[in-house]
UniProtKB/Swiss-Prot annotation:
It comes from Escherichia coli O9:H4 (strain HS). The active site is at D25, K134, C167. GO terms for biological process: nitrogen utilization; uracil catabolic process. It catalyses: (Z)-3-ureidoacrylate + H2O + H(+) = (Z)-3-aminoacrylate + NH4(+) + CO2; (Z)-3-ureidoacrylate + H2O = (Z)-3-aminoacrylate + carbamate + H(+); (Z)-2-methylureidoacrylate + H2O + H(+) = (Z)-2-methylaminoacrylate + NH4(+) + CO2. GO terms for molecular function: hydrolase activity, acting on carbon-nitrogen (but not peptide) bonds, in linear amides. InterPro entries: Isochorismatase-like_dom (IPR000868), Isochorismatase-like_hydrls (IPR050272), Isochorismatase-like_sf (IPR036380), RutB (IPR019916). It holds the Pfam family Isochorismatase. This is Ureidoacrylate amidohydrolase RutB. Belongs to the isochorismatase family. RutB subfamily. Induction: Up-regulated by the nitrogen regulatory protein C (NtrC also called GlnG) and repressed by RutR.
Amino acid sequence: MMTTLTARPEAITFDPQQSALIVVDMQNAYATPGGYLDLAGFDVSTTRPVIANIQTAVTAARAAGMLIIWFQNGWDEQYVEAGGPGSPNFHKSNALKTMRKQPQLQGKLLAKGSWDYQLVDELVPQPGDIVLPKPRYSGFFNTPLDSILRSRGIRHLVFTGIATNVCVESTLRDGFFLEYFGVVLEDATHQAGPEFAQKAALFNIETFFGWVSDVETFCDALSPTSFARIA
């Protein structure tokens, strides 16, 4: 059953049962003091409301029959998956750079199995959800995301998570190039860097690549009364 989500720059209509809510990298690394972003000098002090808003969005999406996909960014303990000096990721990843500056952190930042890699305690995948590791910013790079979505007839993606201006935007952009309709819930995301990075990412998304809405509006669009209005 179709519903219409109020968004910028215009409303978008979609079928929740042929859509997915994507939770990007809600790991201790990105959302918890003592995690990678915090240790690398980024401000994570305002991530708690984002976690709560994602909980709300996930609950509403699951009740409406949407597929929930959780991403975890990171690599093996030896960081082979991160790429060596021949990879730009080796030079640009702030996690890798932080570990080179502070060798005592080696094997602790974004390493699979570590506390840093784990999802925050408040966000727990449920049976029927899909949890995917990813080795780069985009959730489409070297993951089965595209085939998972296409095999289910899913064309609409609703994004939450951290960081808006890095992994969220990268995944939404790649989805745009693959003909997916991407919506980001702005109050269920958080930037890496100053506030202007959040504003710039949202501007790019709503102007060039997708749509921007918020959690309350999203939940309202998934309510039974909204489906009744469309019908």
